[in-house]
A protein has these predicted regions:
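C-terminal regulatory/interaction module of P-loop NTP-utilizing enzymes
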Residues: 1-163
């Protein structure tokens, strides 16, 4: 992204390898997003960040918003069940942060995948294993810890119910 720095300056132009100079349109708006904690992603270069007018870190939305969004996207109707699923997703995210488990992710996409999988399988526990736990970490020991510390206190192995 550092190669774009000259476009973000006041003069807003970049010279292509062909020698052609491209001028930035005066109404240009640049939006940059990244997940720096994801494997393969790097931190954004400070010189690039310095050229931004506004920098905002975005965390997971509140549980209420997560419930609303997940139900809207999936068509799920059981708000109590979805709220329990949101609690598990948030608790997994917290557990991973507190225990330095950084090789996976757990957020809205995992939640939505879990709800949709549960609709198909009618097995909330097994669906959690293949949509939430499996994405949170590849380490088998950490997965077992997530299952016993976070998943099973809310959803026992035998529980089967649609979202």
């Amino acid at each position: 992204m550092v190669g774009l720095n000259s476009l973000l300056e006041q003069t807003g132009s970049i010279t292509l390898p062909t020698g052609e100079i491209i001028e930035r349109h005066p109404d240009t708006v640049v939006v940059v997003t990244t997940n720096i904690s994801y494997e393969g992603c790097r931190r954004i270069n400070q010189s690039f960040i310095d050229r931004m007018s506004l920098v905002k870190d975005v965390e997971l939305p509140s549980p209420e918003i997560m419930i609303q969004r997940a139900m809207s996207v999936t068509g799920a109707t059981d708000e109590i069940l979805v709220s329990q699923m949101v609690q598990v997703v948030n608790d997994i995210s917290i557990y991973c942060r507190q225990n330095s488990i950084t090789d996976g992710s757990c957020g809205m996409r995992s939640l939505i995948d879990w709800i949709l999988s549960t609709e198909i399988t009618e097995d909330i526990y097994q669906s959690a294993l293949s949509t939430v736990i499996s994405k949170a970490t590849a380490d088998e020991t950490d997965r077992e810890a997530l299952i016993s510390a976070v998943l099973e206190p809310i959803f026992s192995k035998k529980r089967r119910k649609k979202a």
